[in-house]
Amino acid sequence: NFSGINNFGRQYASGDYLLLLNNDVEVRNADWLTELLRQCAHPGGAAICGAELFYPDETLQHAGVVTGLGGYAGHSHKYRKAGGSGYMFRAATVQDFSAVTGACLLVKTSVWDEVGGLDEAFAVAFNDVDFCLRVRDAGYRIAWTPYAQLTHYESKSRGGDEKDPVKARRFAAEQQRLYAVHGKANILHDPYYNPNLTMDREDFSESNDLRGLKEGRITVQWRK
């Protein structure tokens, strides 16, 4: 239980900030932790800051989380080649998101305590999304920075969920809990994501509806 492990660790932490960090990541730039702290420590700074994570093949694994992608949540610019600026420079700009991954997440200890830490009912999946949404709903900012970079050997810590029926059932239950806690409509309408873009992929391409309007396959009926 990832949530339980981190909640347990909080009992023994005494700093002003907590860093959630998976044991399957490797640091890419020396000042990564300074950069995360920079985004949180200045006046008006974020309560949470996440990092830019890469796969070992030099494609992006995480550049912020968009809720609603794939029906629940997905990673911005996932699988994009490293080095580009992304959609509207969003892969190269410090910005706010609704959530960031818990694989590398810095949070103010006071905010962690205020919202009660991680929800242990989300044992593995979506605990980071749920946590960030509760922090956002409490009035705080969640930031992501491309200037803290790490390589993430995703799921090496625990393995995949797809082929194990027990893990698959747990994952499905956590998906439904995300809707139950935060509301399906809320999950599907991320305020940091253009509703004209696709919810099926993580590449910021146009939605089928917008493409249909541009190609004339879909028409809009105006009412007086």
What are these regions (language model features)?
Residues 21-23, 119:
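Active-site acidic Asp-centered loop
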Residues 49-52, 145-146, 153:
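Short glycine/serine/threonine-enriched helix-capping/active-site loop
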Residues 18:
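Short aromatic/hydrophobic "clamp" motif used to bind/position activated sugar donors
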Residues 1-13:
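Glycine-rich, basic loop-to-helix element that forms the pyrophosphate-binding segment
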